[in-house]
């Protein structure tokens, strides 16, 4: 893993507050950028772009060139692990991902225990290209989906509003569901370690659907698998910097931070600021949490919202980000407005 002492983003995750918070945006390589749309059209399908090292590196670097963010995040997807496990994964235009559902114990019995990491070599090649092209002060983030969130897609075969198929399977067939989680934990550890070896300076674990789980299930299916991943990565890379993003976890965030051992936690725009300052930011770095819709809105509403986020969190260890991914219809001028406001 490259040295990172001069990177403001890594410094915050190491416990050092920065006078001007480092910043990046979830989904910063995306459809709001005309240069991204051009490369995406050239690539063909979404997975074709993910698995073309030169093009994936190019779209990873585009927002860094345009905005000078403090961190790049490799262009990929949380569903590349199911793909490498031999599951059918495809992305339909306007519909999102489609997978072959693992919706009963007999189907789960067919799940391969180990991914074919040769299928993911293009991701590691893209990381190497990006790391070589980045300024030494700019961090490079690798990532994976948390086992719970990846499992929700694997069980249902597609995204659902409340993740009912995965929740029902975890209640009805907990042993079979635990097998899916165990396979994802083991392969996520290996995948994240390979990303560090390829040049990533930090890692983020995206648990987009953590917030749909009741407390006992949140502990079992979100917290514990994430803890095992963090422990597994740190067994090989003790100083690995890891951010967790259990979206919608709310009052369960302090327990998540304590149990998982993450260096930082990403929060969505619904998080209560005083609670986060006292119970979370007092222990780890906080990343977030501008509402992506106010970034679309722009104007005085955006200025007020940015000022509010800074007033809430910038006195502690803080990374400025959105509370979730940037929306495709976001005007570039509003991203520039946000940048100027944060950086003064």
Curated annotation (Swiss-Prot):
Keyword vocabulary terms for this entry: Cytoplasm, Decarboxylase, Lyase, Porphyrin biosynthesis
Annotated positions binding substrate: 27-31, 46, 77, 153, 208, 324
Keyword Cytoplasm attributed: yes
UniProt xrefs under Pfam families: URO-D
Catalytic activity from the UniProt record: uroporphyrinogen III + 4 H(+) = coproporphyrinogen III + 4 CO2
Record SUPFAM superfamilies: UROD/MetE-like (SSF51726)
Pathways involved: Porphyrin-containing compound metabolism; protoporphyrin-IX biosynthesis; coproporphyrinogen-III from 5-aminolevulinate: step 4/4
Protein function: Catalyzes the decarboxylation of four acetate groups of uroporphyrinogen-III to yield coproporphyrinogen-III.
Oligomeric form and interacting partners: Homodimer.
Protein name stated in the entry: Uroporphyrinogen decarboxylase
Organism: Bradyrhizobium diazoefficiens (strain JCM 10833 / BCRC 13528 / IAM 13628 / NBRC 14792 / USDA 110)
């Amino acid at each position: 893993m490259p040295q990172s002492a001069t990177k403001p983003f890594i410094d915050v995750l190491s416990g050092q507050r920065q006078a001007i918070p480092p910043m990046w945006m979830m989904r910063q390589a995306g459809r709001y950028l005309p240069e991204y749309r051009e490369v995406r059209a050239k690539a063909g399908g979404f997975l074709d772009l993910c698995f073309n090292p030169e093009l994936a590196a190019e779209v990873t670097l585009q927002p860094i060139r345009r905005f000078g963010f403090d961190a790049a995040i490799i262009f990929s997807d949380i569903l590349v692990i199911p793909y490498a496990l031999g599951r059918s994964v495809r992305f339909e235009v306007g519909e999102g991902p489609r997978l072959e559902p693992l919706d009963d114990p007999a189907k789960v019995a067919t799940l391969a225990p180990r991914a074919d990491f040769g299928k993911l070599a293009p991701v590691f090649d893209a990381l190497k290209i990006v790391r070589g092209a980045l300024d030494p002060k700019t961090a490079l983030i690798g990532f994976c989906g948390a086992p719970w969130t990846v499992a929700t897609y694997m069980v249902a075969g597609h995204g659902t509003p409340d993740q009912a198929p995965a929740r029902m399977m975890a209640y009805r067939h907990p042993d079979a569901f635990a097998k899916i989680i165990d396979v994802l934990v083991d392969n996520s550890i290996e995948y994240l370690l390979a990303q560090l070896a390829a040049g990533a300076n930090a890692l983020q674990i995206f648990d987009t659907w953590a917030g749909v789980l009741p407390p006992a299930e949140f502990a079992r299916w979100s917290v514990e698998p994430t803890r095992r991943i963090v422990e597994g990565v740190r067994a090989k890379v003790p100083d690995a910097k890891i951010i967790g993003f259990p979206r919608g976890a709310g009052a369960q965030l302090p327990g998540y931070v304590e149990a998982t051992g993450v260096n930082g936690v990403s929060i969505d725009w619904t998080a209560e600021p005083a609670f986060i300052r006292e119970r979370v930011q007092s222990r780890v770095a906080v990343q977030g949490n501008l509402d992506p819709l106010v970034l679309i809105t722009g104007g005085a509403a955006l200025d007020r919202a940015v000022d509010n986020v800074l007033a809430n969190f910038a006195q502690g260890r803080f990374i400025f980000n959105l509370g979730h991914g940037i929306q495709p219809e976001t005007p570039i001028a509003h991203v520039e407005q946000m940048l100027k406001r944060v950086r003064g």
